[in-house]
Amino acid sequence: MKELLDDLRLLGIPTAIVTDLTAQIQFRKVVYFGLDHYFDYIVTSEEAGYDKPHEAPFQIALEKMRPKGNCIWMIGDNPVNDIRGGRDKINAITLQKIHEGTVVGTGENIPDAAFTEFNDLRRLVNRLGDVA
């Protein structure tokens, strides 16, 4: 995952974590896993006053990131909170990370794409970076 985050940084793509965990827990996790310098912003449900899939956490992330254009990617593992929330609330392209204990969303929770390894997503990002 760190290689993917390095690629995003080199391409100048802003990144944010949008989480339902409390700020204290999320900040500790990010530091523990050595990811603190990879993300530009962390938005918690505590800050937003609502849990995902409410639009507030997503909107706060967009306000902080101020992305160029209207191409937003939401990468998450929860079909309802991340995938449907990202698509319905901020019109994001949705990418679902599949790992043990998760299933690909169906119906209104279906992602635009699903992946199991971050290297798969990294190859896609690099191809898109070559085109841009």
Model feature map: region roles:
Residues 2, 6-10, 16-132:
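Asp-based, Mg2+/Mn2+-dependent phosphohydrolase catalytic module
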